[in-house]
Amino acid sequence: MTQAAEATLPPLNVPSYVKHARLIDWVQGVVALTKPARVVWCDGSQEEADRLCEQMVQAGTMRRLNPAKRPNSYLAWSDPSDVARVEDRTFICSQREEDAGPTNNWAAPAEMRNTLQGLFDGAMRGRTLYVVPFSMGPLGSPIAHIGVELSDSPYVAVNMRIMTRMGRAVWDVLGADGEFVPCVHSVGMPLAEGQADVAWPCNPVKYIVHYPETREIWSFGSGYGGNALLGKKCFALRIASTMGRDEGWLAEHMLILGVTTPKGRKFHVAAAFPSACGKTNFAMLIPPSGMDGWKVSTIGDDIAWIKPGQDGRLRAINPEAGYFGVAPGTSEKTNPNAMATLKANVIFTNVALTDDGDVWWEGMTDTPPAHLIDWQGKDWTPEIARETGRKAAHPNARFTAPASQCPSIDPEWENPQGVAIDAFIFGGRRSTTIPLVTEARDWVQGVYMAATMGSETTAAAVGQQGVVRRDPFAMLPFCGYNMADYFNHWLAVGQRLADAGATLPRIYCVNWFRKGPNGKFVWPGFGENMRVLKWMLGRLSGEAGGQEQVFGISPSYGDVDWTGLEFTPDQFQQVISVEAPAWREELALHGELFEQLAQGLPPALSRAKADIEHRLAAVQA
């Protein structure tokens, strides 16, 4: 680098408490590449957050909400082109293409580095580079890992403060030579001298790139959510799943909850659902009337890191410190705990603004306000919505809220040792075929259930099945390596635990979404899902019966506690039945998935499929 070029770079301003020479060198290298106007090391303080939020209010990026309605809360509206994760621009750049597998986008690492070098060269001109240190998981936990994100977005800095343990304390844990995942993010919109900024800078060209071997993340062009908050899906799932593969643990797209029985016995459950299946609602479940004395507590709503503990049991932490939840559909009816969490200290993105300075989204109330400003800054009324179909909030509008504000938060949620998992639950959105609840006969069959799970992508008409999108383990967009190898990894983790004499968690498959002949959902869902949870826990403690069926073990009508709910045996039959013709079709679809993943597919899963086919043939005979 020439002296003239060096002279144009800003001072690094490294705080005296940052002692990590390798990290400082890395920051210096990124500064030299991206050429920001300033470098700011985030300390995670309230004063810093207030300053950055005020800066964004002045820039038009955010607006402060009515403090009487939502204390210390803000609303951001993104560019209409930058509203969601971009799966087609998300790359796993492993050294070998087969390590990414057929379900990921792969690019040769050397070529991708070349491309990104060109894009990031001068990408932060005129902007501030924020150094954002964060811990995924409680600081110092043996299950936690540290990352550092370099971003030119103050929106990223303030959201990461809520979503992770972010700030000065991270440097104490990192010390002079600790391991960290390097993350680089730019909105990709450099500013020339004197050029006015826009409220939501972004670039039509987008890349979200992961290098599994070097544990690096580079993101360009988007300021939104999972594309820019690199601790979330990029680190906590794509990179962490690869770390787990190499080190013998699991990084999963799962909620974690605690369930305490009326007698005071506590269980912990981790559950994986694809999007639009009510994951956050289940994580914050309130037991229904008739189930007095049961208590459900929330440890996490989206991601679980699970490592074998010293006792041999699988122990899980929520690596996040906040909720980045979908707002539309969240209401006092569907999720009162989430609504209580959102009362203060929240950043809302792409929801509507009310005339009194509060927020609204579809599904929040039965009757919408008479007038709103929608997520694109336009006037909105119920009449306009009826005439044009225009939504007040974007369907993927989000809230970023501290987990500590959740009324149902579990007292163990920050236990650095994690909580011991008693059961795994996997579920999708299926209008037919899959029963309300099934217990796997063993670990291998449970892995088979999770590997073949899916959701309908279209609302099924009466008597018609929607198109099923397979989403193994709800990890299809988030697994950082070959999906067949991921199945092998789950089998290997179970085998290691069994060999060590540990008690394996039971595995269950659920489906809240079976429809009746009238095309309506039969199962009431929401809090009533507690009845299914109670049956599972009864199975764990040896108190609940069950009957063998083709796919595993399911409850009979008398095995479920119906206190306080009118649900007939006929209705129960509609949600629990296993129809042979539908299952023949289902198994054929499983076969299609296995063909796609044929290279490296565990033989144990092919045997599990053959076993189900054999049982199905026996039923028909």
From Swiss-Prot:
Its EC number is 4.1.1.32. Its cofactor is Mn(2+). It catalyses: oxaloacetate + GTP = phosphoenolpyruvate + GDP + CO2. Mn(2+) binds at K233, H253, D302. GTP binds at A276, C277, G278, K279, T280, N281, R398, R429, F526, G527, E528, N529. GO terms for molecular function: GTP binding; manganese ion binding; phosphoenolpyruvate carboxykinase (GTP) activity. This is Phosphoenolpyruvate carboxykinase [GTP].
